[in-house]
């Protein structure tokens, strides 16, 4: 690991090598999905890690620095990437993921007024159970050439666990919700440091834009962000209350986005928890 000043942020490697074409799999998916613990808890939500700050708000300037943010403001516009389900589900998956990551990295032209300001990952970064040993192959290595901050909200695959010894979202929190930027073991010899989001759900404040990112828990389907009147006591209502508060605070601002995983559905209406939260602020 190269020497570097403490608390300094690093994004891309200056001379990234060739893309991976495959990675080793320690356990088969069947071994996870057939575990008694996973089957027993298949229809249960898991506790949501508490945010480190209240309210959980992160300013882009805190990550990028004053100079870069001023460049964005002076340009009068902001460009960014947003993509979900980037994890490589199979050992040959890095090929497909690398094509997408490389295409985004190629959009950096050294022009502050048009270069992407950040990448926002919309969940399911790591398949199949968010294990820390796959963060190198499914996150750090594919995005080693991306020359900007990367923020993320977790998806169900990032949080689901297969045994009572696995802590939900532990690896995600370590790599994206660190108290200060450090070089995580999962990054290997790559330069990117951990992100310092205040929590797994938070608001990213950027010039011309605010993104309210939510964590929809581990169930398949539209997700859960509240207790639903006591049906999911492990979840509680903190996240829904946060969403309501942020929608009210940001009501007068242009460019406010609420993001969660899954990001869209082809059929059916929004579920009551989200519909109610979005309607209360008016």
PLM-predicted stretches and their roles:
Residues 38, 153-248:
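Flexible, acidic/histidine-containing loops and adjacent segments that form or flank the divalent-metal
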Residues 82-84, 117-124, 128, 150-156, ...:
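Active-site neighborhood of phospho(di)ester-bond hydrolases with catalytic His/Asp-centered motifs
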Residues 89-90, 127-130, 157-164, 219-222, ...:
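Active-site environment of divalent metal-dependent phosphoester hydrolases
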Residues 1-118, 136-152, 164-202, 254:
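Acidic, histidine-bearing metal-coordination/catalytic regions of metal-dependent phosphoesterases
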Residues 7-9, 19-21, 26-42, 47-48, ...:
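His/acidic metal-ligating clusters that form di-metal
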Residues 125-128, 142, 204, 214, ...:
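Catalytic cores of eukaryotic secretory-pathway lumenal/extracellular enzymes that build
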Residues 77-90, 208-222, 258-261:
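Active-site-proximal beta-strand elements of phosphoester/diester hydrolases
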Residues 88-101, 129-135, 232-239, 279:
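Phosphate/oxyanion-binding active-site loops and adjacent basic polyanion-contact surfaces
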């Amino acid at each position: 690991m190269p020497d570097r000043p403490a608390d300094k942020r690093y994004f891309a490697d200056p001379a990234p090598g060739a893309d991976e074409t495959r990675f080793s799999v320690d356990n088969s998916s069947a071994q996870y999905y057939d575990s008694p613990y996973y089957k027993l808890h298949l229809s249960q939500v898991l506790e949501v890690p508490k945010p480190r700050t209240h309210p959980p708000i992160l300013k882009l300037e805190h990550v990028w620095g004053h100079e870069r943010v001023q460049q964005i403001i002076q340009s009068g516009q902001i460009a960014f990437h947003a993509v979900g389900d980037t994890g490589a589900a199979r050992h040959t998956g890095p090929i497909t993921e690398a094509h997408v990551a490389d295409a985004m990295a190629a959009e950096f032209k050294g022009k502050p007024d048009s270069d992407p300001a950040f990448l926002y990952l919309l969940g399911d970064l790591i398949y199949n159970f968010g294990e820390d040993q796959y963060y190198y192959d499914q996150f750090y290595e594919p995005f080693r050439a991306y020359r900007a901050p990367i923020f993320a909200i977790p998806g169900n695959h990032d949080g689901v666990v297969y045994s009572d010894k696995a802590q939900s979202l532990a690896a995600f929190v370590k790599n994206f919700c660190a108290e200060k930027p450090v070089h995580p073991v999962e990054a290997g010899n790559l330069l990117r440091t951990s992100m310092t989001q205040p929590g797994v759900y938070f608001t990213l404040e950027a010039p011309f834009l605010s993104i309210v990112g939510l964590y929809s828990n581990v169930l398949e389907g539209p997700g859960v962000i509240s207790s639903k009147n006591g049906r999911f006591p492990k979840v509680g209502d903190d996240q829904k209350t946060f969403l309501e508060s942020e929608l009210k605070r940001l009501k007068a601002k242009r460019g406010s986005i609420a993001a969660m995983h899954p990001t869209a559905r082809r059929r059916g209406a929004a579920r009551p928890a989200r519909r109610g939260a979005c309607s209360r602020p008016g």
